[in-house]
Structure formats: structure tokens, C-alpha cells
Amino acid sequence: MFGEKFRDRQKPMVLVLGLGESGLAMARWCARHGCRLRIADTREVPPNLSALEAHGIEGNFVGGPFSEVLLEGVELVAISPGLSPLAADLVPLIATARERGIPVWGELEFFAQALKTLGESGYAPKVIAITGTNGKTTTTSLTGLLCERAGKKVAVAGNISPAALDKLTEAIDNTALPDVWVLELSSFQLETAHTFEPDAAVILNITQDHLDWHGGLDAYAAAKGKIFGKNTVRVLNRDDARVMTLASSEQSGAQLVTFGVNEPVRDGDYGLLRDNGMIWLVQAQDRDATDEPAPTRRRKSESTAPPDIGLKRLMPADALRIRGLHNATNALAAFALARAIGLPGAPLLHGLREYRGEPHRVELIASIEGVDYVDDSKGTNVGATVAALDGLAQRVVLIAGGDGKGQAFDPLAEPVTRWCRCVMLIGRDAPQIRAALEHTGIAITDHATLEEATRAASAVAQPGDAVLLSPACASFDMFKGYAHRAAVFRSTVEDIAAGRGTMI
């Protein structure tokens, strides 16, 4: 379970850094397999400390700043995804570990090594991986549903929770190993993966987020790119130029499928067709080709004569229960991933029609007197809010603001100009958003609370508009988390409805 280095003695001395959900999962996994443990956290009393005893995990816990002393006697380092490799006390520790030849793994590497070991006994599941700045959870949940509708036993795990190692442990204990793993992966998790190679993977988009953790956008994008192994079918968003740079790689044998909001022009690619006022999910097909799935027919290194391309209509976009063009492309990505592992199309299309979406992700709360109230509290970065505005494609009163995490808000200007009636600002970094939007000519007002902003938005919204909570910011300056922020928004909308004699 711990790789070739420990082949003859699969019980290395492990240092677990960080005791969040993934750190606890790695500690449980290592303890389960007989490893000796040292567990360290910068917090003297992390919340999961009591869970170590509750789970019967024996190990030496060390609280406080990290130091190289922690490496004494250690043969393997397990690092939690919440720890930035640029942290001042972590940089020398990791550098010393590598100088000493001590492997540094994250949870995803433990998972990859475990699958490799289980494979020696004949276990060969399909593995699908999903990453991107925005849309990961929706696409992951939808992909899992599609695989289930195709008759597969599916495990959905990773950044979406539960931790992949916990899900694997449960499957082993219940002798119910799945046919398909669908994993939502963050850039943090991918940063410390070395041998992970899924059968199919997607990068939905790359926009600025977590730049303080990675040190810059290029490093962030490079971490996202680690989702692809040499033989992974690459599903890429062709509307995102930074994503498409990953189509060109030294791994020239990699199979490639793209999706986007426009009509596809290459055999096997996916997109949207606008015809007589309707939008269709479509796939480009070579009229002269066989019925094999496109990824098995074409590799991106092959050169052939231009095919005669037709567009196969899969379903109308308005048959989806999830709102917005961005969710239509999420649906295309999920469909492409499921097809890439050889699943039949018909049950997948039924699954697309079923999926109702995830909470706080462009979720329609209510329609009151012709105005839609939409909760996108999970929109914690600029890219998410841009996607929500462009995806709804209607006149919007936007509520934004909070902890900006060091982002530049300039990319909001174009969609705000195109779609917004006015913008209501809340939170610590409202002045930065105002500065980025002042030249748009759109009315901008500041509000002390989300309740106040929501009522003000309701007062100016016209029938046919949407009042959209899509903050483009984290929530911790004012709330316990994005779910708490969403609850305050919903409660205020309920009060507005009640005041107009409507129940929701």
C-alpha cells in the first residue's frame, strides 16, 4: 500500500503534517496498515485531535510551528492539502525531507498507491477525475449520477467529501469495491500527487484563486495540470485559453476531447448549437466514421484528411434542471467523461435530465412577482461570478463582496456591464470591487449587511430580473462559511416573500 520503496516492509514510520479531514484520513489509513505515526499540526489543539483517540490511532502528536526535528526517524511524509508548500515553516522541512530521500505524499498519492497494490489482486476500476476553479462539485456529482445510471457501482469522493482514503477503507471493509471512482480534486490535492493516472479527467476552467497558496497563477495552473497521466483521456474546456495550453504536451499519445459554449468542429468534441431560439447539447461526428467512441478513434498526434463533420443533437439545454450556460457545459463535461470510459450514451442522457444540482451553486430559491432569487453563495471567486452572470444570461441585480483573497476584480467589469441593472456590495473588500467597476456606469451601492443588500436589490429589481447572490469572495469576514451566508440570504428572501403575501 506504500509503494516500491517499502515493498519488503510495508510499515514505514510516517510523519502526518496537518490534522484536517485529509490529515485524519491519512493517519487512519497508515495506522490501519501498521505504520508508526508522528502527527504534527501548527495548532496546539486542532479540532480533530480528539478523533485520533476516538479512532484508536496511536501516535505521537506535536503541536506548534513545524521544524526539521519532526523528521527524526521518519521514512514517509504525509502532507495535508490545506498546508501551502510556500509556508515559512514548511519550506525548510520539505526541502530537508527531499534531501534525505524521504517521499512527500498527499492523500491522492496514498490513494494511487493503494489502487496499484489492489490491482495486483485483479481490482481494475475506472477512475474519473475532475478539477477546475469552478464547477467541480456540480460536475463530480453529475458524473457520479451518470455512471450509476449506466449500471455501474460508483464511489464519489475527494474534495467533495468524504476523503478518498476513507471511502476506499469503507469499500474494502464492506467487500464492495466500486466499478468506477469519480474524484473531485483541488489544486492542493494534486500538488502532492506523483503517480496518479486516471482513465479520464477534466479541467473545467482556470481562473485566479488560491494564488497565495500556490504563489501565482502559473503555479496554480501547473498543479491543475497534474490531473493528467500519460494515458489519461483529456477532457478540456476549449473556451479557456489557459486550459487549452494543456492540450499541447510532451505526452503526445494522450487522447483529447473538448467542450465549449460554441458549436464543435472536431470529430468527438462537444458543444452547444443554437437553432430557432433553442439551445441544444451536441456532439460533432465524422459522417464517415464508425460508431466507436471518438477517443478510441483519434489521438491528437494523428494527422488525417479533414472529416465531413455533422452535429448530433443530444438533448435541449432547457431539458436540464440546472440553470445557466455554464451548467450546460458542466453537463457536457460530465457526459464526455462517462463516454470516455466506454459507457453507453442513452442512460447518460436520462441522467442529465434527472440531475437537480447542488445547493448554493446558482440555485433558484424563489420567484416573487416575476423576479428570480438565485443563491450562488458558493461563488467564492471572480471566475465563479463571471460564470454565473454569463450563464443566467438575464438582467441581474448582483450582490457581491466579502473576503477577496487577494484577487483582482477587473474581470467582473465586462459581464457586469452586459447583464447588471445595479450592484449591491457587502463585506471587507467592497471598496476593491467598487474600484474595479466604477468605470462601467452601472449603479453601485454599499450595504452594511447581506439582509440590507438583499432588500435593496429586491426594491430595484424588475419583472424578468434575477437577484443574484454571487459574492466573488470568501465569506469569513462576515459569516461562518458560504452555507451560513446562503442561509441568511434565503431567510431574507423568505421574509420578502411573506411581506408580499407569498410563501416559498
From Swiss-Prot:
ATP binds at G132, T133, N134, G135, K136, T137, T138. Pathway: Cell wall biogenesis; peptidoglycan biosynthesis. The keyword Iron does not apply. GO terms for cellular component: cytoplasm. GO terms for molecular function: ATP binding; UDP-N-acetylmuramoylalanine-D-glutamate ligase activity. GO terms for biological process: cell division; cell wall organization; peptidoglycan biosynthetic process; regulation of cell shape. It is found in: Cytoplasm. Disulfide bonds: none annotated. Residues 284-310 are annotated as: Disordered. Its EC number is 6.3.2.9. Its main location: cytoplasm. It is an enzyme of class 6 (ligase). Keywords: ATP-binding, Cell cycle, Cell division, Cell shape, Cell wall biogenesis/degradation, Cytoplasm, Ligase, Nucleotide-binding, Peptidoglycan synthesis. It catalyses: UDP-N-acetyl-alpha-D-muramoyl-L-alanine + D-glutamate + ATP = UDP-N-acetyl-alpha-D-muramoyl-L-alanyl-D-glutamate + ADP + phosphate + H(+). The keyword Nuclease does not apply. Pfam families: Mur_ligase_C, Mur_ligase_M, MurD-like_N. Gene3D superfamilies: Mur ligase, C-terminal domain (3.90.190.20), Mur-like, catalytic domain (3.40.1190.10), NAD(P)-binding Rossmann-like Domain (3.40.50.720). Cell wall formation. Catalyzes the addition of glutamate to the nucleotide precursor UDP-N-acetylmuramoyl-L-alanine (UMA). PANTHER family: UDP-N-ACETYLMURAMOYLALANINE--D-GLUTAMATE LIGASE. Belongs to the MurCDEF family. NCBIfam families: murD. This is UDP-N-acetylmuramoylalanine--D-glutamate ligase. It comes from Paraburkholderia phymatum (strain DSM 17167 / CIP 108236 / LMG 21445 / STM815). The gene is murD.
